[in-house]
Structures are given as C-alpha cells and as structure tokens.
Swiss-Prot record:
Induction data: Constitutively expressed in embryos.
Chain's role: Cleaves a variety of carotenoids at the 9-10 and 9'-10' double bonds. Probably not involved in abscisic acid biosynthesis.
Enzyme Commission code: 1.14.99.n4
Keyword Oxidoreductase part of the UniProt annotation: yes
Reactions this protein catalyses: all-trans-zeaxanthin + 2 O2 = 4,9-dimethyldodeca-2,4,6,8,10-pentaenedial + 2 (3R)-hydroxy-beta-ionone
Pfam families named in the record: RPE65
Binding, Fe cation: 224, 272, 338, 528
Assigned GO CC terms: chloroplast stroma
Protein name: Carotenoid 9,10(9',10')-cleavage dioxygenase 1
Subunit composition and interactions: Homodimer.
Species, as recorded: Phaseolus vulgaris (Kidney bean)
Entry keyword set: Dioxygenase, Iron, Metal-binding, Oxidoreductase
Enzyme class, broadest EC rank: oxidoreductase
C-alpha cells in the first residue's frame, strides 16, 4: 500500500461525533410523560439481574502500570489485549437488557513482560447525549415488551422528532466486538457504524470518531466483520428492519468500501454473524424475526423466533456485484449467534458454527434466572454442496459452547482447532475448551469433557467466571503449528471479588496457566475480545 492510500484512509471517512441534543420545554414534557408511563405500566419490582454482582457497571480506570504477574508473559503477547462489553453509565428509567449497556473497553497493555490495565468508555453519540442530560434518555431493548414497549418506542420517536435527541450520528452503544483493519482498531455494535479507537503506547484508549468510509457507509455495520489475513480485505454486512434487509460490503486493504450488494430475504431478521471462505461469503437467514406486533400481543421482545421456519444459508461469490449468483441451502430450524470459521473443500463450503436450538433473548433480560436449563448451544459442522445443492450438518459437541475462536491466520481457510467457552448460563463462562476437528466426536458423552474431539478443557474453578478467549500465535503467519500459541481471557473470582487476566498454553491446555495478571479493579462480564499486536499498535500510532 502506497503513502497515498494511507493518507486517504486515515483522513477520509473518520467523522468527529458532535451531536446537538436540546434540553428545553419539549424535553421536560416528554420526561414527564415517560415518568407517568413507567409509574403506571412498568413493574418496578422486577429485578435487574444484569446490573448486579459482576454484571454491575464500573467507572473508567486510567492506565495502571506494573501489575502483579504470576508466571511470565511471553514476548509474542507484546501489544494490547482488549475486550468490550456493556457498562451503563446511567441507571435505566425502567427495563434493562444485557445488550443495553454503554460500550466500555478493558485493555491489558503488555510490553516486555510487564502489564498495564486501562478501561475507557467508547465515546458514542448516545453516551455523549446522555452525559449532556445527566441521565438515561435513549430507548432500551429491555423496555421493548408488550404495550409498554410500544409506548416507549413512541417516546423515543417523539424525542427524535422534536430534536431532543440527535440521531445524525446514530444511537448505538458500540458494546459488542472489536476488529483491527487498515491501521485502526474499530469498536462495533450491529445497530451502528464503527467507532475508531486509538491505542496509545502506555495502553490508554481514546475514541477518535465514527467511521463512515467517506460517506459510503449509509447503513448499520455488523459486529462480526471478517478480515482475510491473506488479502488484507475486510468483509462486512448490515441488517435492517426495512428492505433490503441485508446489505453486503467489501472493504479493500486500503480502507476503500466498495458498492453495496443488497441481499433479498423474506423477513427482517437478526443476523449477528456471517462467514467467508477464499471465494465465498456465507449469509444466514435464520428465523429470529423483527415483529413489533407480536411484541405487543405476546409481551415478548421485539425479535421473536419462528420455530416453524427452516434455517437458510446463502453462499455468494465474495466479490459479486449483485446477488444474482447467490445459492440458498436449507437445514433444520435453528439460530446461530457465532461462527468459528468456514472454508472450501472440493465441491463443498464448510461452516463450523455454534448452533442454538432455542434462542430466547428474554433470557438476557433483567429478570433471568442464574442457570439456563434450556440454552443448548453446540458446535456443529455444516456443509453446502455447490454442485448438488444439498446441505448437511453434523453435531460436534455436547452443550453448551459459544464464543468460538480459531487461529485467525486461517480465517476463510481450512483449520484444525477451535477454541470456545463453556457456559453454565448465557453469560457465565466456566472455562475454555479446545476441539480437534480431525478427531471424531464422542456422542456417548452428555457433557463437555476431554475425549473424542475435545482435546483440552481449562476449567476456571468454583466461583470463577470468564469471557471470550483470544488465540495469539507464538509466531505470525501459518508456518508454525496451528495451535502453537496462547489463549488470553479476563477472569473474575466472585469469591474474592477480584479480576485477573489468564494466559493459557493453547497447545497443551494445561490447568497451570502460563501467567496470571492481577487487575486493580473489577472487570464486569462482557462480550468479545481482540488482540492488537505490537506491530499494529505502532502502525496505528502513525495516524
């Protein structure tokens, strides 16, 4: 990439987020109306499970250096391990869903065996406006149930129509995931555009602005774009409640976003993830459908799952200019939050994914029980034959597995190992599991344990819970063994009330961690993690 590409990509497309909310008479009248609705229609006795314990929010922490390290931090971990998650700055007016919290990034800067911890809010338009008012103002997923939900939607529409809230920079939380592309760390949530984050030498994090790719991005942007490690391109999509329900995008290694490719499907769905191979993009038309009428009628969330519909998978040549050559495949009804990887094998496209039989987003609402008896997320292999048009699937694990990660040097190419989290609820990670896709699963096992295709299981132990683990190779590229590296994750000890970062040997999955870093503050449970290498940190520092 020449200097011109760097210059244009760095300056073009980064928008300073400067919303203009108004706090006049209209604002006060709507606040009063909202207060009355909450008083008469909301059951305030309902507990906010996802605001208690280690789900509860924390304040920002500036860089805190020279943390206690038990063991050693290998040189390949020089860089910054970051994880984002929901952390509401202001108390909710009524309901609260785990997905509602403001995005906060927790970072561990590692350099020459030493560790520094930092946590910073992503300075979104939404957060800036609520800071201006000093209270919660934006609509929450946790409110979107029944008649009360419909009325709260109208309150939100009134606030935007009367310019109490300014949606010209979107209204997302940016609390879901992180990716690095074209010299920028991007913080993501699927209801908004990406926010660019600068990582400083001391580990500190600063929100630079919103990325709109020189006004070429006019729709939402998935929290799970895919970066091809061989070409440097990034592949993405957005979903919407109005047609086109899915829009596919390709971004060059130089940061140029190509023209949109609309994908035609029958219903407005939630599509949280997708996949790429060397030549294809894989879309998932799964029946978690946006149905506001059912929200009012059945007192459910605004997305409802239709168990009568098949799961559809669309395979599109990844550089297609339109959807003309997309091939659709059907499999039994399911939902998928997260894919591990995909690749091509002879006439087939292979997808490794975490398949969920019964998605109930209510389970991550405010009143959920601690354990989820029916949350059965299992590792699956799905195959789509491009020659015959047939689809098949094979179960690879018992329940419950999520947040699958691979050595990302193999993104879109055949790989052997998958690392996932074991869960005792939708949010409580009890350990890290390693699958060997070359081995056959042991279907006699009803729970996740070593044997068959389960090559290792790192159990966090009683009262200790984690979040997504990121694989970091010891050597860049694919010349060394695929599992020659480390897994890094945040861990919270509920008994001691302390948080840590664990570093695990990804090859041996030894119960003895390579390193444990004690953190100065509690780190709440969150969503997706990422590792910014030392090379990337130095590259983005030039912007």
């Amino acid at each position: 990439m020449g200097d011109d590409g760097k210059k244009n990509g760095a300056e073009g497309g980064l928008v300073k987020v400067d919303p203009k909310p108004t706090n006049g008479f209209s604002s006060k009248v709507i606040d009063l109306l909202e207060k009355l609705l909450v008083k008469f229609l909301y059951d305030s006795s309902l507990p906010h499970h996802y605001l208690t314990g280690n789900f509860g929010p924390v304040t920002e922490t500036p860089p805190t250096k020279d943390l206690p390290v038990k063991g050693h931090l290998p040189d390949c971990l020089n860089g910054e391990f970051v994880r984002v998650g929901p952390n509401p700055k202001f108390a909710p007016v009524a309901g609260y869903h785990w997905f509602d919290g403001d995005g906060m990034i927790h970072g561990l800067r590692i350099k020459d065996g030493k560790a520094t911890y930092v946590s910073r809010f992503v300075e979104t338009s939404r957060l800036k406006q609520e800071e201006y008012f000093g209270r919660s103002k934006f609509m929450k997923i946790g409110d979107l149930k029944g008649l009360f939900g419909l009325l709260m939607v109208n309150i939100h529409m009134l606030r935007t129509k009367l310019k109490v809230l300014d949606l010209s920079y979107g209204g997302g939380t940016t609390n879901t995931a992180l990716v690095y592309h074209h010299g920028k760390l991007l913080a993501l949530s699927e209801a908004d555009k990406p926010y660019a984050i600068k990582v400083f030498e001391d580990g500190d994090l600063q929100t630079l602005g919103m990325l709109d790719y020189d006004k070429r991005l006019g729709h939402s942007f998935t929290a799970h774009p895919k970066v091809d490690p061989f070409t440097g391109e990034m592949f993405s999509f957005g979903y919407a409640h109005t047609p086109p329900y899915i829009t596919y995008r390709v971004i060059s290694k130089d940061g140029y976003m190509h023209d949109p490719v609309p994908i035609t499907i029958s219903d407005p769905i939630m599509m949280h993830d997708f996949a790429i191979t060397e030549n294809y993009a894989v879309f998932m038309d799964l029946p978690l459908i946006f149905r506001p009428k059912e929200m009012v009628k059945n007192k459910t969330l605004i997305f409802s799952f239709d168990s009568t519909k098949k799961a559809r998978f669309g395979v599109l040549p990844r550089y297609a200019k339109d959807e003309q050559h997309i091939r659709w495949f059907e499999l039994p009804n399911c939902f998928i939050f997260h894919n591990a990887n995909a690749w091509e094998e002879e006439d087939e496209v292979v997808l490794i994914t975490c398949r969920l039989q019964n998605p109930k987003l209510d389970n991550v609402g405010g009143t959920v029980q601690e354990k989820l008896e029916n949350f059965s997320n299992e590792l699956y292999e799905m195959r789509f034959n491009m020659k015959t048009g047939e689809a098949s699937q094979k179960k690879l694990s018992a329940s419950t597995v999520d947040f699958p990660r691979v050595n990302e040097n193999y993104t879109g190419r055949k790989q052997r190992y998958v690392y996932g989290t074991t869960l005792d609820s939708i949010a409580k990670v009890t350990g890290i599991i390693k699958f060997d896709l070359h081995a056959e699963p042991d279907h006699g096992k009803e729970k996740l344990e070593v044997g068959g295709n389960v090559q290792g299981l790192y159990d966090l132990g009683p009262g200790k819970f984690g979040s997504e683990a990121v694989y970091i190779p010891r050597v860049p590229g694919i010349e060394s063994e695929e599992d020659d590296g480390y897994l890094v994750l945040f861990v919270h000890d509920e008994n001691a009330g302390k948080s840590f970062v664990h570093v695990i040997d990804a090859k041996t999955m030894s119960a003895d961690p390579v390193a444990v870093v004690e953190l100065p503050n509690r780190v709440p449970y969150g969503f997706h993690a990422f590792f910014v290498t030392e090379e990337q940190l130095q590259e983005q520092a030039k912007l």
